[in-house]
Regions:
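C-terminal motif of bacterial Sec signal peptides marking the signal peptidase cleavage site
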Residues: 20-21
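A short, well-structured edge-of-sheet supersecondary motif
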Residues: 64-95, 322, 328-332
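Short active-site loop at a secondary-structure junction
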Residues: 74-79, 91-134, 145, 182-189, ...
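Active-site SXXK
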Residues: 86, 100-125, 153, 197-201, ...
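Active-site helix/loop module of the DD-peptidase/beta-lactamase fold
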Residues: 118-156, 205-243
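A small/polar active-site loop signature that marks catalytic segments
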Residues: 155-234
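Active-site-proximal alpha-helical segments within enzyme catalytic domains
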Residues: 196-200, 244-265, 319-335
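Active-site Gly/Thr loop motif
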Residues: 225, 230, 281-330
Length: 359
């Protein structure tokens, strides 16, 4: 049987550092694991491209990974990418294809807020009245609704239940009655909140949202596929405030996940303030499922994810960046929305299988 290029490269690498003899074959039942810290001469970071190693060389169970692949094939997902301690161990599917990220966009903008708040350009304690925010589509905001702060919008706790651009039918069906909850008293996953977060960012910084994503994340993280032209502003007659969809590849999303897995640091630069990473991935609301909610990040409930701390950027039927900071692990899952036929139960089963293979 012919060995893959990656397999030959890994065997050569192991032999070159003295971990296996030159006569060993991929069929050997045991391979001495590589320590990524020693292998990289310190912490592993991607450069212009990702470094890839066989998962078995990093101590993963090949049998358990076979079960991951079975689930992945069953789901017909578009891509799965797994980063273990800064090194790619799984790259399946179209990991360089730019898909619309759906609601994963919100966690990226949360990161931008952290940067600009740290620089003093944004104050999340400001309310809608102070910012001059209303909605020109009737009925406009009441004085009570205008007391909602940016922090409450980040938490999806504004109490403003105005119709919004890019709402799914499920969001529309779940929207509370207008004026039924005061700001800060109730969680509802609210596109009006998230869209206004984007509008206020532009207002306070004077910068285009997609250019800021490029300058603040794509450039320093050396993203391979993202450009400002990947995004657009989606206006609808329901509200004056647009949504801000953008497309990104799995391999670029993984860089953002790794940034947050490492407390906002990239190599020797603190991109996102460490205290913002902690604050934005803290749970403020119980969503009723496997997750709580932070500042436009989903926060895994204790003991649900094999005892690990986990937070995630989730979007659509299955777009996800799962971040496990305690074990320096990032998992990115992508779907081709028009053809994908499964949902979050299958995605979570896939993630469970990944964690079992890692352990």
């Amino acid at each position: 049987m012919r060995m893959s290029v990656l397999g030959r490269r890994t065997v050569f690498l192991l032999a070159s550092v003295g971990l296996i003899s030159c006569g060993a074959t991929p069929a050997d039942p045991y391979v001495e694991p590589i320590d990524p810290v020693e292998h990289c001469g310190g912490t592993c970071w991607p450069g212009e491209t990702w470094e890839e190693l066989e998962a078995a060389a990093l101590g993963w169970s090949t049998d358990a990974l076979d079960r991951v692949r079975e689930q992945y094939a069953h789901m017909a997902s578009n891509a799965l990418l797994v980063v273990d301690r800064g090194v790619l161990v799984v790259r399946w599917g179209q990991t360089n294809r730019n898909h619309i990220v759906q609601s994963v966009r919100k966690s990226f903008v949360s990161g931008l807020y952290g940067i600009y708040e740290g620089e003093g350009a944004i104050d999340i304690s400001l309310d809608m009245a102070a910012l001059g925010i209303d909605d020109s589509v009737p009925p406009s905001l009441t004085d009570l609704e205008k007391q909602a702060t940016l922090q409450q919008l980040l938490q999806a706790r504004s109490g403003v239940y105005h119709e919004a651009a890019a709402e799914s039918q499920g969001m529309k069906d779940a929207r509370p009655e207008r004026w039924s909850h005061a700001p800060g008293t109730f969680y509802y996953y609210n596109n009006w909140d998230f869209n206004v977060i984007g509008v206020v960012f532009i207002q306070l910084t004077g910068e285009d949202l997609f250019q800021a994503l490029y300058d603040r994340f794509a450039v320093p993280l050396q993203m391979q596929d993202f450009a400002p032209s990947n995004g657009f502003y989606q206006y609808e007659t329901l509200s004056e405030h647009p949504a801000y969809p953008f497309a990104m590849s799995a391999q670029d999303m993984a860089r953002y996940g790794l940034l947050f897995a490492r407390q906002g640091q990239w190599r020797d630069e603190q991109i996102v303030p460490e205290d913002w990473v902690e604050e934005s991935t803290t749970a403020y609301s119980d969503t009723g499922g496997d997750f709580n909610y932070g500042y436009m990040w989903w926060v895994g409930k204790p003991d649900r994810f094999h005892g690990h701390r986990m937070f995630a950027a989730l979007g659509g039927a299955g777009h996800a960046i799962f971040v496990f900071p305690d074990i320096d692990l990032v998992v990115v899952h992508r779907v081709d929305a028009p053809t994908y036929r499964y949902g979050w139960n299958e995605v979570m089963e896939l993630l469970d299988r990944v964690i079992r293979a890692r352990q």
